């Protein structure tokens, strides 16, 4: 097994999730992905806040497509097994699965980081294609093209170095690496990429412009696959028998997707069911210091907005059509608040509101 190419890591991760007490079947997203294979719309980037199941879905996608594993025993029991394209695509492809949240032990520079990724992928390619001499090629993409095969890419936490504010002087280099690896390459059958914030947040011009982006506020195609729907939470409550849905709804109250589907944060729901107790389970999802400076200096009257919400009132959320490449506080005050405190509504409009529990 390779580290990135045709790894069994995703299947092992998904098996663990599948065996958990409160498993929710999100496999029907695969039916929609199957329709994109080998087409112009094969590049998609799905972004969500932390703890909304992005990595779990990525593991599922890789475990389904990879021909290096046999995942039929699991997927035969899931909803995807009932669709026409199920058998046709199950365990049929070379899969390159990279999570960008790993740092090398040998050093903490950008060169250490990117070379770890490149060398690991090259090593995997040589293992599967022993007749290829990597020294004859200039880029990883050239090596992949020389195989004559096609690949499905599953890329998780693509924006890790941006969200962690690492290697500022090399962030454009990283965008170039992804662009040269993926854009207009005949060996790419499908590229499924996830992150916290959209590509437009960091990129302008032609970098990664081949991707269709699906953000929390604008995703009308995949919204129900990230987070738990009301029906899914009701079913989990029935399985639990001790926790009633009304209590979970009072505490967590859900989020409304772009097409009106109510979504609950998986971590909060699962932890409440495991402990038979509702409280805030949003630990380690984001640093408070990302918000504190805006409150301290009342940037764009954000502090006033928070006071208004604590009083039980709602504030409108400004949804920008595009993200700015270089983030500037003066242009995105409401967006910072939406990300920091979250948005929650029973209507089809987006507001920020704090409710006392």
What does each model-identified segment do?
Residues 1-319:
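Phosphate-binding site recognition
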Residues 324-357:
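Domain-level recognition of nuclease-like catalytic cores that cleave nucleotide substrates
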């Amino acid at each position: 097994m390779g580290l990135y190419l045709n790894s069994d890591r995703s299947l092992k991760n998904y098996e663990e999730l599948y065996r958990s007490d409160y498993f929710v079947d999100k496999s029907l997203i695969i039916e929609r992905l199957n329709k994109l294979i080998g087409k112009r719309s094969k590049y998609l980037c799905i972004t969500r806040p932390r703890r909304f199941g992005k990595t779990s879905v990525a593991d599922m996608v890789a475990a389904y497509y990879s021909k290096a594993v046999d995942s039929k025993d699991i997927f035969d029991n899931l909803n995807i097994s009932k669709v026409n394209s199920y058998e046709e695509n199950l365990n049929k492809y070379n899969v390159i699965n990279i999570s960008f949240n790993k740092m090398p032990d040998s050093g903490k520079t950008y060169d250490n980081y990117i070379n770890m990724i490149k060398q690991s992928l090259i090593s995997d390619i040589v293992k599967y294609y022993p007749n290829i001499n990597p020294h004859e090629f200039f880029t990883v993409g050239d090596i992949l093209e020389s195989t004559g095969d096609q690949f499905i890419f599953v890329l998780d936490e693509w924006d890790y170095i941006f969200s962690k504010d690492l290697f500022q002087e090399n962030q454009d280099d990283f965008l170039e690496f992804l662009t040269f690896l993926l854009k207009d390459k005949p060996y790419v059958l499908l590229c499924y990429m996830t992150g916290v914030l959209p590509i437009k947040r960091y990129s302008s011009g032609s970098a990664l412009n081949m991707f269709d982006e699906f953000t929390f506020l604008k995703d009308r195609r995949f919204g129900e696959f990230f987070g738990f729907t009301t029906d899914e939470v009701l079913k989990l409550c029935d399985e639990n028998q001790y926790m009633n849905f009304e209590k979970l709804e009072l505490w967590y109250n859900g989020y409304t997707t772009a097409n009106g589907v109510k979504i609950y944060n998986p971590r909060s729901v699962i932890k409440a069911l495991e402990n038979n107790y509702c409280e805030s389970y949003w630990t380690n999802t984001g640093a408070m210091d990302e918000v504190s400076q805006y409150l301290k200096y009342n940037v764009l009257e954000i502090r006033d907005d928070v006071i208004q919400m604590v009083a039980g009132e709602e504030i409108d959320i400004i949804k920008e059509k595009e993200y700015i490449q270089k983030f500037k506080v003066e242009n995105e005050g409401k967006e910072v608040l939406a990300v920091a405190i979250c948005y929650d509504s029973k209507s089809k409009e987006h507001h920020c509101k704090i409710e006392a529990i």
